[in-house]
């Protein structure tokens, strides 16, 4: 069951990577991250530690893909902020939800969830810096 869930999540991320439009790829990756967050929350409620970890890893990979897609687009966040701002808002929401998840999981899983929250926070800070920088 656990392997099947990982395979399904990886398939979704692989399909997202095939999206040729980098901005749309970023949005789809962040939507996938939100879905992974829902999966992690449900698994946490059910007490399934391995599923929580797999879903949080998927969330981290999705956020990284979203940010890298925006960077690879070559567009300036200052001149074309639409997708950068959307990503910033979604990562802020994910950080808030990860904080709640970190408080809900066991102590052994908390370290991993907090490390992913810190990574999402770093991406969020990078997005804000990209939007706010002058040249």
Name each model-derived stretch.
Residues 8-135:
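Long, charged/polar, soluble alpha-helical segments
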